[in-house]
Amino acid sequence: NNSDPYLHVMHVHSGETHYTSTTNPEKINVYANCARNMGENCIIFTTYHSLHRIVEADIEVNTIYFDEAHNSVQRNFFPATEHFSEVSERCYFYTATPKHSLTVNKPGMNWGDVYGQVICNVPAPDLVDQGYILPPKVVVKQLPLIKGRKVMYAEDSDNLIETIDDNNIDKTLICARSTKQIMGLLSQSDFVMQLQSRGYSWMMITSKTGAIIDGQKVDREKFFDTLNTWGKDPEKKFVVIHHSILSEGINVSGLEAVIFMRNMDYIGISQSIGRVIRLGSTEKTFGLVCIP
């Protein structure tokens, strides 16, 4: 699966992949130690949800990189994080949104014994000034006040279509409140019909439903391959709807705007905005942030 015969690649997570993949600690141990015994290298890609499986595999880890490291402070993930911070030779943490704690019993990235000291911290304005990311542009849409918790799918559809039309957006990330809201929007309103009449495709992905493109269920690899292909196509118009699964970790340069349909914490908002301020075509000069 790779061009280097002396490099062995394994995935440790429950997601779909064509690479060697398992969450079984015994198989992880055998795979890693076979490579080690042959004097060859092994790279393991895992998730925070599956990191404890590598702890259980009891293998030697020389270097570990924690991407989106603010997730590592979560109660379910921190024990494995702390373990590898102690036993690995080199341990690095990367995040645009560090999560600190002022509570003794609640882990935070300011815990020096686990996370060490900050090696590099680059302010976002510097990244904008040096041309690495685009500045965000915030647009606030005034909505009528709805009493109670009743979900109005038709109103959601109207608000989204108006926002897309008013701002002339071709490639949009929509952050919904829940999977239920997404399914209601797609099945109990004219949202899909309105998109199709304007020449848009649509995509959705949640942990409950999996990935869907224009009504067809697909695997995750197909979803992300399509997302990247459409993002690079200047003629393609689409919306991608999610609850939380796309808030971080994706790099699609073509996404022009994010529309929030729910309240999010600081990290969730920052990470979602980060999806649309990536460099794109020369015509893309900012990432649009639409807030109801």
Give each language-model segment a name.
Residues N71, S207-P292:
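Conserved RecA-like P-loop NTPase helicase motor core
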Residues I44-T47, E89-A96, V239-H242:
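Structural recognition of the conserved hydrophobic beta-strand(s) that form the central parallel beta-sheet
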Residues T179-T206:
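Conserved helicase motor "Helicase C" RecA-like lobe of SF1/SF2 P-loop NTPases
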